[in-house]
Each structure stands twice: as structure tokens, then as C-alpha cells.
Amino acid sequence: MAEFRRRRAKLRVKAEEIDYKNVELLKRFVSDKGKINPSRLTGANAKLQRKIAKAVKRARNIALIPYTRTEK
């Protein structure tokens, strides 16, 4: 049986750019429903994924990005 390896998405963001005030960048790491995307989709390593999650949670807390999207 042939083995498959998933192609890992490369993250083209520096750790210094990830900040809770950078809303446009953080929206790339949040799904349409408002959930934080996993590192297998974002391509971030564990340390960077924790930094992304912390920044998203801070931005949500001060209402820069919504917790969930609004249903119509």
C-alpha cells in the first residue's frame, strides 16, 4: 500500500508580526464560524500557534474581532 504524506502549509508570517492589534492578520487564522484554525491548516509550529491563539483571545476580549459570526 502506498504511503501518503500531506503537504505542510508554510506559514509566511514572522513571530514579531503576530499581535492582538493586527486584526487583518489574525482573521487569517480564524475560521468563518469564529474558531481558531489548527496548526495543521495554518502551518504554524507549536510555539507560533500558541502565540496566535493568545493574540486571537486578547483581540476577542477587547472586541476587535467577534467570538462568533452573526447568523442571518
Swiss-Prot record:
The keyword RNA-binding applies. The lineage of its organism: Bacteria, Fusobacteriati, Fusobacteriota, Fusobacteriia, Fusobacteriales. Binds as a heterodimer with protein bS6 to the central domain of the 16S rRNA, where it helps stabilize the platform of the 30S subunit. This is Small ribosomal subunit protein bS18. Keywords: Ribonucleoprotein, Ribosomal protein, RNA-binding, rRNA-binding. It comes from the Bacteria. Belongs to the bacterial ribosomal protein bS18 family. The keyword Disulfide bond does not apply. It holds the Pfam family Ribosomal_S18. Part of the 30S ribosomal subunit. Forms a tight heterodimer with protein bS6. GO terms for biological process: translation. GO terms for cellular component: cytosolic small ribosomal subunit. SUPFAM superfamilies: Ribosomal protein S18 (SSF46911). GO terms for molecular function: small ribosomal subunit rRNA binding; structural constituent of ribosome.
